[in-house]
C-alpha cells in the first residue's frame, strides 16, 4: 500500500515544494531567453523584423496550444515522468540555441563579437535550423504548462489550495523577474554575444530542475489516469460550444495579445529608440515585481469573494 510522503513543511508536501522550485528554475530559463528572442533571431541569425516576429509568435502560440495534447499524455504517464521528459527536452533545446550560432560561425556565414558581422547568413537557408530547435523547446515547455500546476493541485487540499497557488505564482514571478535581470548586465560586458551565451544559462537552469525532479520529487499522486483522445475531443467540443467560456477566452486572449508585446516588440523598440545602453529586461520586470509584492495581499483580500468579482 502506497503511503503519502511526509510533508516537508507544515501544510505542504515535499512534492509541492519541489514542483514550485523547479517551476522557478523553468521560468528563469524561459524569460532569460524569451525577453531577447526576437533580437536573437534578428541580430544573431539574420532574420528581418517580420520573420523574427512570425517565428516568435508561432513559437508562443504553439507553446499554449500543445498542452491540450501533451497534458493528456502527461496524465497517462504521471507527473514525475512527464517532468523528466519536459526538462530533458528544454535542456536540449536551450543548449541548441547556444550551439547553433557556433555552427553557423564555423561555416563562415557570420562572425560574432560585441557586434555581429554577417557574411551570407541572412541569405542562407542554414538559419532556418532554428525551427527544429525552437520546436523542441516548445514541446518541452508545453508539458510544463500543464503538469506543474496540476502537481500543485494534487499536492494541496481544499484548505491549503488558495495559499498553495499563491506561493506557486509567487515562485513563477520570482523566476520571471530573476531570469530577465541576467541578460542586460551580460550585454553590457560582451555585447551582442550575450544573446548567445544567455542560452547556456537557461540550459543550466533546466538541468538543475531535471536533477531536482529525479532526486527529490516523490509523490503519492504519480499513477497515470489520463483520458483517451476521443474523450479529449469530446471535451474540446464542449468548450467550443460553450459561448460563455468562449467569450471569457476571447477577453483573456486580448489581454495576452497586449502583454506579449513586452517580449515581441518592446525590447527592439527600446534599444532602437534609447540606444544600446537601454535595459529592456528591467522595463519588462515591472510586471513580475508588482505580482510578487502584491500576490499574497490580493489572495487574502479576495479569498471570500467570487472568481467573477476578482476578475472584475
Tell what function each PLM region has:
Residues 31-39, 179, 243-284:
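Extracytoplasmic gate region of multi-pass secondary transporters
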Residues 131, 196-215:
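Symmetry-related core transmembrane helices of the 12-TM Major Facilitator Superfamily/SLC fold
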Residues 2-13, 223-249:
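Juxtamembrane intracellular "pre-TM" segments in multi-pass secondary transporters
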Residues 57-72, 285-298:
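Central cavity-lining transmembrane alpha-helices of secondary-active solute carriers
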Residues 143-157, 270:
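Intracellular juxtamembrane helix-capping segments at the cytosolic ends
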Residues 62-63, 162-187, 203-209, 284-288:
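Glycine-rich segments within core transmembrane alpha-helices of 12-TM secondary carriers
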Residues 88-125:
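C-terminal ends and interior cores of transmembrane alpha-helices
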Amino acid at each position: 500500500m502506497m503511503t503519502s510522503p511526509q510533508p516537508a513543511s507544515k501544510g505542504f508536501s515535499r512534492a509541492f515544494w519541489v514542483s514550485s522550485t523547479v517551476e522557478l528554475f523553468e521560468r528563469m530559463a524561459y524569460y532569460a531567453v524569451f525577453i531577447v528572442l526576437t533580437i536573437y533571431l534578428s541580430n544573431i541569425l539574420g532574420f528581418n523584423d517580420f520573420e523574427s516576429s512570425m517565428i516568435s509568435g508561432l513559437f508562443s502560440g504553439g507553446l499554449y496550444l500543445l498542452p491540450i495534447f501533451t497534458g493528456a499524455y502527461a496524465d497517462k504517464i504521471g507527473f514525475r515522468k512527464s517532468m523528466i521528459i519536459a526538462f530533458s527536452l528544454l535542456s536540449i533545446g536551450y543548449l541548441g540555441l547556444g550551439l547553433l550560432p557556433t555552427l553557423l560561425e564555423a561555416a563562415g556565414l557570420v562572425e560574432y563579437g560585441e557586434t555581429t558581422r554577417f557574411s551570407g547568413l541572412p541569405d542562407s537557408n542554414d538559419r532556418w535550423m532554428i525551427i527544429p530547435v525552437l520546436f523542441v523547446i516548445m514541446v518541452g515547455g508545453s508539458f510544463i504548462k500543464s503538469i506543474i500546476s496540476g502537481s500543485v493541485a494534487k499536492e494541496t487540499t481544499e484548505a491549503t489550495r488558495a495559499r498553495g497557488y499563491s506561493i506557486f505564482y509567487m515562485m513563477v514571478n520570482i523566476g520571471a523577474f530573476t531570469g530577465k535581470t541576467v541578460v542586460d548586465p551580460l550585454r553590457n560586458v560582451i555585447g551582442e554575444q550575450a544573446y548567445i551565451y544567455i542560452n547556456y544559462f537557461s540550459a543550466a537552469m533546466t538541468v538543475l530542475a531535471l536533477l531536482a525532479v529525479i532526486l527529490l520529487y516523490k509523490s503519492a499522486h504519480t499513477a497515470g489516469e489520463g483520458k483517451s483522445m476521443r474523450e479529449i475531443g469530446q471535451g474540446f467540443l464542449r468548450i467550443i460550444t460553450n459561448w460563455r467560456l468562449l467569450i471569457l477566452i476571447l477577453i483573456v486572449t486580448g489581454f495576452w495579445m497586449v502583454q506579449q508585446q513586452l517580449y515581441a516588440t518592446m525590447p527592439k523598440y527600446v534599444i532602437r529608440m534609447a540606444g544600446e545602453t537601454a535595459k529592456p529586461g528591467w522595463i519588462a520586470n515591472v510586471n513580475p515585481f508588482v505580482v510578487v509584492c502584491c500576490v499574497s495581499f490580493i489572495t487574502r483580500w479576495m479569498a471570500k469573494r467570487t472568481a467573477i468579482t476578482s476578475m472584475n
